[in-house]
Design a protein with these regions (language model features):
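A general beta-strand register signal
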Residues: 7, 415, 560, 714-716
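Secreted/periplasmic carbohydrate-active enzymes, especially glycoside hydrolases
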Residues: 1-57, 66, 70-74, 132-133, ...
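Catalytic beta-strand/loop cores that center a nucleophilic Ser/Cys/Thr
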Residues: 469-470, 486-579, 595-622
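Mature N-terminal, pre-catalytic/accessory segment of carbohydrate-active enzymes
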Residues: 1, 394, 401-440, 444-446, ...
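Short alpha-beta junction capping motif
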Residues: 438-485, 563, 569, 587
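Substrate-binding/catalytic cleft of secreted carbohydrate-active enzymes
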Residues: 39-47, 51-308
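Compositionally biased, intrinsically disordered or flexible polar/acidic segments
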Residues: 619-768
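Extracytoplasmic/secreted cell-surface and envelope-processing proteins
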Residues: 62-63, 83-85, 143-145, 462-463, ...
Length: 768
């Protein structure tokens, strides 16, 4: 390996992988048939993948033999033990692991088995060229890394033919030759889509690593199921869970919409995977990615996150040819800073090519910009050497958009001439419009103004993004929920994108597909409303409810109210955004037409309950912390200078989600003319959280009396160093994983190394 890449025959390779989670629903055990593994690995290759991570298990020899033949690299492992498996979960008994296994180094039976099993693995399969990576196991958070490092060093000395790592996603040790993780300690996350376009990467994070880092468990975007898949479970595993979920869909009158929801959530998954993978390909120091996963997983409740089902059959979401556009040895890339443009702007983009093949290409790279009918707007071509093993800068383009007169979707295509390598991106272009002068009432509350207008037979556009209560509405999100609410039940996001009636005349001036493509991301702030009691109401935009819930939802819908006509929009139309303005224009344009004639009636009293308004409390927090679910000014309510025992009544909680209670063990609270802080040689902060959420804990350490404070921090057992503060304040950002909050709490411990004690003046938890 080099500093940032895994080398095969001394050539940098971008690792494109998928997780195999030991899931065989027909038999209940892994196949030992070479042909079956050849079938599976041929599917890998068809989607442009080159390796597999066997999550916490080692496959039989048939898999290694098939991988040798097909050309797939293997990462094999032994087990998975994390801290949450070692505790009794009274509130969630299904999460209590049998035997409550302790971590390696603290578990005599496992401490004997694991090094022996590692040795057996390399003795049995070590001669297979596909066996390129070995890791002890998955997320070994409560294990002794010093002891595990000794095991790995012994293997490296005995058989240096492959790369070795101790654990995924917890801690990087000196013996690690590569790392699979979603977070580099004290540095940042290894994947995610930042920004509103494609002009982004994660080089600022990966460049700080000193070994190749592969993004861990990328994706985990669920797709709504097709109920006829239940019939495929004819073996060891019965789909009783899906049968139960289907009955909930029947109850709420949405069973027949499964294909629409499947297509819409699947299309959203596709653009998100494309965005994530290209972001990593644009990152020169990234070693690759491992997806979770291309297939559904029927464990942990069920995580229907694949574009293939649990039987390796296509779900009709994306073809191998389409996926290889951005998952291949050679991938054309485009950098532009936003997806939505106005006609008084110039569309600009940078063209790159990631080439991780074994050949330098010298051939023209061609780009075109076309509309949805294929009409060419502009094109260009440039020939530069596309060097192997790097991301190549190829060309830049500028397209004047001023001749476009109507809103439209446009395609940027980049093709490497004479090769199969091609990629495509969508952008949306909107001309400037003055809102139509109408007598339509536009209002953001369902109050006497709206009711009076409807009773008089007027038309009303209700901008409802701030309306609704918890029991009759749900927040809107662009991305789907994570993995599965069976396993991570505390998520506030309970949707999988939205199905859009794209042919509806409300969208005549707002080009859209039948799913939420990138232009919707700008405005996906607001509410959708639960309409289970309205089976005959057909939403214009229907968010896809998590199949564990199966509510019938509506974020844009129309109805007849008294003598009037009401169009409801749960998206924020008041944003300073071309997308918000264009959608508002399109809705108003529709409302001026004769075909705005809703037939479904809803009573005023019903709408009063649906559109209840709760004023937001005003908060004062530093910029960047507005979205905290907990923000504490430590000891701010203390009146007199000096020290006092900690009590929550002396803190000031600027923001506090009702689920985020906390307690602090410290020496005291201190107050002087410089401020207030929790202080202690050793402190413990325990924060209750919604279960299964992910985020960042920000802690502000003080040293205003110049004691050169320094210490050791431990968040859920992961240690980091607080360096000498030298009299300065210091914000520390600590990554919180979903597994950390799966027991409904996080625990931060601090230990003073220098300066007498540590001081914490503010603490904030921001949920991602």
């Amino acid at each position: 390996a080099s500093r940032s890449k895994i080398l095969i025959n001394n050539r940098p390779v971008f690792m494109r992988g998928n997780l195999d989670c030991l899931h065989f629903p027909l038999t209940g055990y892994p196949s030992c048939d070479i042909q079956e593994w050849e079938r599976i690995f041929s599917i890998y290759k068809s989607y442009g993948l080159n390796h597999v991570r066997f999550h916490s298990w080692c496959p039989p020899e048939a898999a290694f033999t098939a991988a040798d033949r097909i050309g797939i690299y293997i990462q094999a492992e032994v087990l998975w033990i994390d801290w949450w498996m070692s505790v009794v979960r009274k509130e969630r008994p299904e999460m209590t692991t049998r035997g409550l296994p302790k971590g390696l180094g603290h578990n005599p039976s496992a401490d004997k088995f694991v090094p022996e099993e590692l040795q057996r693995m390399i003795e049995a399969y070590g001669n297979h060229p596909s066996f390129t990576m070995l890791c002890i196991g998955n997320e070994l958070g409560n294990s002794n890394f010093d002891i595990m490092q000794q095991w790995i060093k012994s293997l490296q000395e005995k058989d240096p033919r492959r790369l070795y790592a101790i654990s995924t996603a917890r801690k990087i040790m000196p013996a690690d030759q590569y790392m699979v993780t979603h977070n580099i300690p004290q540095t940042g996350g290894t994947y995610g889509i930042n920004g509103s376009g494609t002009d982004n990467d994660r080089e600022s994070i990966y460049s700080k690593a000193t070994i190749p880092v592969i993004a861990h468990e990328v994706g985990q975007y669920p797709v709504y199921p097709l109920w006829n898949e239940i019939d495929k479970y004819t073996g060891a595993l019965e789909a009783r869970n899906l049968e139960s979920l289907r009955q909930q869909a029947v109850k709420n009158h949405i069973e027949h919409q499964d294909r629409k929801f499947h297509e819409a959530s699947g299309a959203l998954q596709t653009i998100l995977y494309k965005g994530l993978i290209e972001n990593l390909l644009r990152t020169p120091s990234c070693a690759g990615f491992q997806m979770l996963s291309m297939t559904d997983y029927s464990g942990q409740g069920e995580a229907l996150v694949g574009w293939l089902d649990s039987f390796w059959d296509s779900k009709g979401i994306i073809t191998p040819e389409q996926f290889r556009c951005y998952s291949n040895d050679i991938v054309p890339l485009a950098r532009f800073h936003k997806y939505t443009w106005q006609t008084d702007e110039t569309f600009k983009a940078q063209i790159q090519v990631a080439n991780y093949s074994d050949t330098t290409l010298i051939t023209p790279t061609i780009w075109t910009l076309t509309d949805e009918t294929g009409k060419l707007q502009q094109q260009g071509s440039r020939e530069v050497p596309l060097s192997s093993g790097k991301v190549n800068q190829v060309d830049s383009l500028s397209v004047d958009l001023s001749e476009i007169t109507s809103p439209g979707k446009y395609y940027l295509d980049v093709t490497i001439s004479g090769t199969p390598y091609h990629n495509r991106w969508s952008i949306w272009v909107y001309p400037p419009y003055n809102m139509p002068q109408t007598n339509i009432i536009i209002h953001d509350k369902f109050d006497s103004t709206v009711i009076s207008a409807l009773e008089q037979g007027k038309k009303v556009l209700l901008v409802a993004d701030q309306l609704g209560k918890k029991d009759n509405s749900t927040p809107l999100y662009f991305t789907p929920l994570f993995w599965s609410t069976s396993f991570f039940p505390g998520q506030s996001n309970t949707t999988l994108g939205a199905w859009i009636d794209k042919a509806h005349p409300a969208f005549s001036q707002f080009p859209t597909d039948n799913y939420t493509d990138w232009q919707w991301k700008e405005i996906t702030q607001g509410r959708s409303f639960i309409i289970n009691e309205h089976p005959q109401l057909h939403p214009i935009v229907q968010p896809v409810s998590d199949f564990h819930i199966n509510d019938k939802l509506a974020s844009i819908f129309e109805c007849k109210v008294s003598k009037g006509k009401l169009l409801v929009c749960g998206y924020n139309l008041n944003l300073d955004s071309p997308v918000a303005r264009q959608l508002k224009y399109s809705l108003l344009h529709y409302m001026t037409q004769s075909n705005f004639n809703p037939s479904y009636s809803i009573k005023i009293d019903t709408l009063k309950k649906m559109f209840a308004y709760t004023p937001k409390a005003m908060v004062s927090v530093p910029k960047g912390f507005e979205n905290s679910i907990l923000y504490i000014s430590c000891g701010k309510q203390m009146k007199n200078s000096g020290s006092a025992p900690w009590t929550a009544t002396l803190d000031h909680t600027e923001i506090q989600d009702e689920r985020c209670k906390y307690k602090v063990t410290c020496d005291n609270i201190w107050k002087d003319e410089k401020g207030t802080a929790w202080t202690g040689k050793n402190m413990t902060i325990e924060i209750q959280t919604p279960e299964g959420i992910i985020g960042d804990l920000y802690v502000k350490f003080e040293d205003w009396n110049h004691q050169n404070r320094a210490g050791l921090l431990s968040i859920e057992g992961r240690e980091s160093i607080l360096e000498n503060q030298k009299g300065k304040e210091r914000w520390v950002k600590l990554f919180i994983m979903r597994e950390d909050t799966n027991d409904g709490k996080i625990v931060l411990k601090t230990h003073t190394k220098q300066g007498g004690n540590l001081m914490i003046s503010q603490i904030a938890f921001i949920k991602q």
